[in-house]
A protein has these predicted regions:
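Bacterial Sec-dependent signal peptides at the C-terminal "C-region" and cleavage site
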Residues: 16-23
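Subset of outer-membrane beta-barrel
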Residues: 23-324
Length: 324
């Protein structure tokens, strides 16, 4: 119990320390169930072939609202003492769209206190901006004619392909797991068309989870998740309960500063079969946008082969039911 209170205190301290303005990158309310999405070092940690299909509609009902689709697949690769994986991403917000394909490798080191993994993920992103969806105060939009009267904005669809690199570390012990990762680093920036080039800041992620031993077949997991671009940061605290690896329910709170307060998250999950899991999260908006949308919906379908592939990593000393 002393370990638990230390963990809770650290979570509250980190949440308060990082309560700056704004938010960075795409939000993800089911992050604790799909950690490979933001940390390539988590590959293979589920000890079998694992796949996830994620869909998120943020601020539903708001025109041009952010939408995200993601496919993650990873599996142990003992020949190289680690794991391999790939990620397919499609995101859209307003006139912008991104489609990415990335592959990853992570090396897993076993020690007396747990498993330590370091991983890297790299690939390409196709970025596009549809100028026909943009409007300016002085633009000319008679009929099908489009002229923004702004040389920095395109009047048609422009696109470009950019390389991207991501990296992370992850530790898994008997009662505690934590990871630190960097995502969305574009070494050459992003180029759209002939004239538009920009260099977005990479995102940094910290994830920490504590495992409370089961009682009455229920396991409790308090979690802290922090995202930052080193200018703006946002913290989220959540707790979830798993019952017999069959049903899960959780609640979370995102944003602890007056300018970063974002949402309260309610989530639930169920095991559909021996290999499939279904999760759903609903974000109740708390920011200034809360009156303009109908909440945020997120759906995750996960698959786990349920078999150890080959031989290599030993079973955990204490079984930590992460599957829900």
């Amino acid at each position: 119990m002393t370990r638990l209170w230390r963990f809770v205190f650290c979570c509250l301290f980190l949440a308060g320390y990082t309560s700056l303005t704004g938010q960075h990158g795409m939000q993800n309310s089911l992050y604790m169930h799909e950690r490979y999405a933001f940390n390539p070092a988590f590959g293979g940690m589920e000890r079998s072939l694992a796949a996830g299909l994620l869909y998120r509609s943020q601020w539903a009902g708001l025109e041009g609202n952010p939408e995200s689709r993601m496919i993650n697949v990873h599996m142990p690769f003992y020949l190289w003492h680690g794991a391999l994986g790939f990620q397919l991403v499609n995101e859209s917000i307003g006139a912008e769209k991104q489609t990415g394909f990335l592959m990853s490798y992570n090396y897993i080191y076993e020690s007396e206190v747990g498993l330590l993994s370091t991983g890297v993920r790299a690939g390409i992103y196709q970025n596009s901006l549809d100028g026909t969806k943009l409007r300016t105060p002085d633009g000319n939009y008679e009929g099908s004619f489009i002229d923004h009267q702004d040389v920095t904005l395109p009047n048609s669809l422009i696109s470009g392909i950019s390389p991207v690199v991501e990296a992370g570390v992850y530790f898994a012990g008997d009662y505690f797991e934590a990871g630190l990762s960097m995502t969305g680093f574009f070494p050459a920036g992003i180029t759209l068309g002939d004239n538009l080039n920009f260099s977005p800041k990479p995102g940094f992620h910290f994830f920490g989870e504590y495992f409370i031993e089961s009682f009455d077949q229920v396991s409790i997991y308090p979690v802290v998740y922090i995202k930052s671009d080193l200018v703006q940061s946002q913290a989220e605290l959540s707790v979830r309960a798993d019952w017999r690896d069959l049903i899960t329910a959780g609640v979370g709170y995102r944003g602890f500063g007056k300018n970063s307060r974002d949402a309260m998250i309610l989530s639930a999950g169920v095991r559909l079969s021996q290999k499939f899991y279904l999760h759903y999260a609903y974000d109740i908006g708390l920011s200034s946008l809360k009156t303009t949308h109908e909440g945020t919906h997120e759906l995750l379908i996960r698959y786990n082969l349920g078999k150890r592939i080959g031989a290599g990593l030993p079973p955990r000393i204490i079984y930590n039911p992460r599957n829900l």
